[in-house]
Amino acid sequence: MENRTSDLLNRLSESATIAMARMARELKASGVDVISLSLGEPDFDTPAVLKQAGIDAINANETHYTPVPGTPRIREAISKKFKRDNGLDYAPDQIVVSTGAKQSLANVVLSLVNPGDEVILPAPYWVSYEEIVKVAGGVPVIIPTTIDADYKINPEALEAAINEKTRLVIYSSP
């Protein structure tokens, strides 16, 4: 049997995030003082209270697959947090918990985008977003922004980018 990767994989670019993380690790290992903004990894150890919660969950045999959108308990807690801290009123069944924003975004794009559909990405954007769109067969349409405009989308540029092939606009803000 021939050992080969899929055509889909061969069409994708190397993850710029992973490449930057590798470069940062190599520089750090060579003695360079590096602040890596690549992977979104915290620069602190896991707090003791979270470690203990994990240990307690294992000891309580909470070690099985959870519902895809998250457990009812965590979705309820998030709903309460949004209401209390952010003034946002979301019901638990409107909340989905995932392993990260990229996973959620990939789920949405793969669910809604067909080959040839266009997906608008205001720049700057997280480097993986363009590749996620390509995996679905979509066409990334980049709208540049500028520091002078505080990286805000120009409404005219957005309107000009929208056409009959536009399926999504991905707007990501910290």
Where are the model-predicted features located?
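N-terminal small-domain helix-loop-helix segment of the aminotransferase-like
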Residues: 2-100, 107
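CheY-like receiver
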Residues: 23, 108, 157-161
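Structural signature of beta-strand start/N-cap positions in the alpha/beta core
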Residues: 33, 118, 139, 165-168
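Short acidic capping loops at alpha-helix termini that bridge into adjacent secondary structure
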Residues: 90-95, 115-118, 164-165
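Glycine-rich, N-terminal phosphate-binding loop of Rossmann-like dinucleotide-binding domains
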Residues: 99, 108, 122-123, 172-173
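Conserved PLP-anchoring active-site segment centered on the Schiff-base-forming lysine
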Residues: 111-133
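A short helix-loop-beta submotif of the ANL/AMP-binding
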Residues: 135-141
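Active-site phosphate-binding strand-loop segment of PLP-dependent enzymes
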Residues: 141, 147-174
